[in-house]
Regions:
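Non-catalytic C-terminal accessory region of glycerolipid acyltransferases
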Residues: 2-12, 16, 110-228
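Catalytic core of membrane glycerolipid acyltransferases/transacylases, capturing the structured
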Residues: 3, 46-107
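Short hydrophobic helices that act as membrane-entry/anchoring signals
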Residues: 10, 14-30, 92, 96
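Helix-to-loop junction immediately C-terminal to a conserved catalytic motif
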Residues: 18-19, 25-56
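Short, well-ordered coil/turn elements that cap or connect secondary structure elements
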Residues: 30-33, 75, 95-97, 159
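A conditional alpha-helix N-cap/helix-loop micro-motif detector
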Residues: 34, 106-110
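Generic preference for hydrophobic
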Residues: 38, 52, 80-81, 164, ...
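Structural motif corresponding to alpha-helix initiation and N-cap regions
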Residues: 38, 88, 110-113
Length: 228
């Protein structure tokens, strides 16, 4: 079904993207947040197809993720699968110029999935928020099955396994205010090579469960650090 669907490649502006890295990273984030702590950047794959799977806590997420994992850290530009709401307004325009494309989080279209598969087939780094929507209660919510299905479908068409990178975004406030704190914890990647892609339904369920467990472990580790 995906093979017959058309996809339009997301756009990464050669002029705007490096400018936004400097503007967002060096000015906006550093001035807005009192501290932005990052752990686990050594886990980021420097090559090959990878899905970055962050928790979703704020509209700041789409700005923080490239700053802590993108071209300045890994040498890679990131593509984004984001909700239609996040493609609205000035932020949406910027995201659209920097690799973002919309997806219906309740019922992803075939064309959106096709775009994701094509990006991974080309060895790109794709950001997918597995919870689907923004949740501000600092709890890990049930994951949508789309990420696992996308990864496994891409794995069937690639010459190498797809890596899935769990990322925890933890804000000190539900609605981050000026001078607040944020912590980003990056876990060890999962690999589609550990799942039987010839049984896609059970493999997707297993991968989704493993990703949920990985995010929960990052959350538990963050809680233990706070108690220490």
């Amino acid at each position: 079904m995906l093979d017959s669907a058309k996809s339009s490649f997301p756009h990464i502006s050669p002029l705007l993207t490096p400018l936004m890295y400097r503007l967002v990273g060096d000015i906006v984030l550093r001035r807005y947040f009192r501290t932005l702590e990052v752990q686990g950047q050594e886990q980021i794959p420097k090559r090959g197809p990878v899905i970055l799977a962050p928790t979703h806590r704020s509209r700041w997420d789409a700005l923080i993720i490239p700053y802590v994992t993108g071209r300045r850290v890994s040498g890679r530009d990131l593509y984004y699968m984001v909700s239609h709401d996040e493609m609205l307004g000035l932020q949406g325009w910027v995201i659209g110029q920097c690799g973002g494309f919309p997806v219906n989080t309740q019922a992803p279209s075939v064309s959106a999935l096709r775009t994701g598969v094509d990006l991974l087939r080309q060895g790109q780094a794709l950001v997918v928020f597995p919870e689907g929507n923004i949740f501000r209660d600092r709890q890990i919510h049930p994951l949508k099955p789309g990420l696992a299905r996308l990864a496994l479908q891409a794995a069937q068409r690639c010459q190498e396994a797809i890596q899935i990178l769990p990322i925890l975004l933890d804000y000190a406030q539900p609605y981050p205010q000026w001078g607040s704190e944020v912590k980003v914890i990056i876990g060890a990647p999962l690999s589609t090579g550990n799942y039987d892609v010839t049984h896609p339904k059970s493999a997707a369920q297993e991968l989704t469960s493993d990703l949920l467990r990985a995010l929960q472990q990052l959350q538990e580790g963050r809680s233990l650090l706070c108690l220490a």
